[in-house]
Every structure is written in C-alpha cells, then in structure tokens.
Regions:
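Metal/cofactor-centered catalytic core regions of large enzymes
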Residues: 1-146
Length: 146
C-alpha cells in the first residue's frame, strides 16, 4: 500500500492479514519511515486496516482530510481504532493507550500527486467490481450515486 506521511516521506507498506507489517522506504525522511515501522512492531494493532471509504460528494477541496475524504473521486483507508464505525478495535486492544487512534490515509490528486491510483476494486461474493479508475468513479459507482 503506498503511503505519504505528513512530512512528505513516501513508502510502500506491506499488508498481511489486514495489517501494515513493514514496508519499503522510497523517498523523504528515512527516520519517519523507520519510526512508523518501529511503532507497528511495538503495537501491531496500530496498523490494522479498519476502514475503506470512497468519496461521493461533488464538493471543492478544502485542504482538510476529514472533509476531502468525502469528495467524489477520492479513496481513503484508515488504520487503528474502528469501534466508532462498528469495528472491533477498541482502546484496550492497543499496547500503548496513546496509540489508540484512528488514522485516515487519503488518496486524492491534490493530496498525493505522487501516487497514482489506477483502479480500486471490491471483491465480494467471489466477484470483483471496479469502483474507481484514475481517481474517477466507475460506471458502477456512478449508478449507485444516481
């Protein structure tokens, strides 16, 4: 999974069993990447994927991830706490209480121009459905939004 950290550092994170488990540094501040991997080792549930979202609203970009994740053509995943979304990751499952956070990772042309999301698919009931291509909604998603 591609990752752009707040300081602009880029990495590819490895996902196993629904969790970030390490990865490869690409560019930027190597210490940022190493600190993230060390945190995953100390407290593995901080890297658990707990949300996948697709923007569905025709709105202008605000520069605030919490709002921009809702804009049509964006996709985001989140790690960490998921109990507020009906998930099972509650604060007591973290090794360190300060790590019991919900961290959104937004993919959008204005936010992550270095990362190209060519296609997003959902695999359900043995079938793949394309939801987005090149930050644009697929006909399937457009039909759902009509």
């Amino acid at each position: 999974m591609p990752m752009k950290f707040e300081d602009g550092t880029l990495a590819i994170l490895d996902i196993k069993g629904g969790r970030q488990v390490g990865g490869s540094f690409l560019s930027g501040n190597q210490k940022t990447f190493e600190d993230h991997v060390a945190k995953l080792r100390r407290d593995p549930v901080t890297g658990e994927l707990g949300e996948l979202g697709f923007g569905t609203q025709l709105l202008p970009f605000s520069g605030r991830d919490i709002q921009d994740e809702k804009i049509l053509g964006t996709v985001h995943v989140a790690t960490g706490r998921s109990d507020h979304l009906g998930g099972h990751l509650t604060p007591d499952k973290f090794a360190e209480r300060t790590n019991a956070t919900h961290d959104d990772i937004l993919y959008a042309p204005h936010k992550t121009p270095e990362i190209r999301v060519k296609q997003v698919r959902i695999h359900r009931d043995g079938k793949d459905t394309v939801v987005m291509e090149n930050y644009r909604p697929s006909p399937y998603l457009e039909q759902l939004l009509a």
